[in-house]
């Protein structure tokens, strides 16, 4: 596959991943009746009532992370082609991206397992609570730290090697800082999804874990598609 196709496909996959995220996000908003992890019976009932919703989000996550792997591989290739001296940073970016994808898949598997347990009579609320609490940092502080590293490394590599415009690098740095601002939420009190800043708060879990990365991927995805067009129009590609 030539550079033209790699850049176009990778950029398109990045944009497609965000499109699926936009479809997925409302599913989280319509879940009802979460009484907290300290109410075992209520937690099991919540999981049963929202089981289809949860499984749908897990399935959509599978699509998103698959598209993200293609996007990350293409961006790594772009970094290497633009400046071979930045290849190491491109590899670091891709490696951190794979770790992020792995963490997401583990968290998704735990979330799906809560539904499986809740639908298996008699359900074990203790197991459901354990798996639910195990997901908080995977979706929150841990994921945010990895996303920040990904965007910071990629932004430096693409600007240093002039693979992408400088403004995209500054956007990546800003998004990385936004993610890092929510990493310390892991130290703030008990998990409470109804509050903004805590290990399970809607700040780190819903806002910071999705929108900064989405903004950066949209910008880079569009630039990669345009990069592919310039490659196609260059004399070397003719």
What are these regions (language model features)?
Residues 1-238:
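Hydrophobic, aromatic-enriched alpha-helical segments typical of multi-pass transmembrane helices
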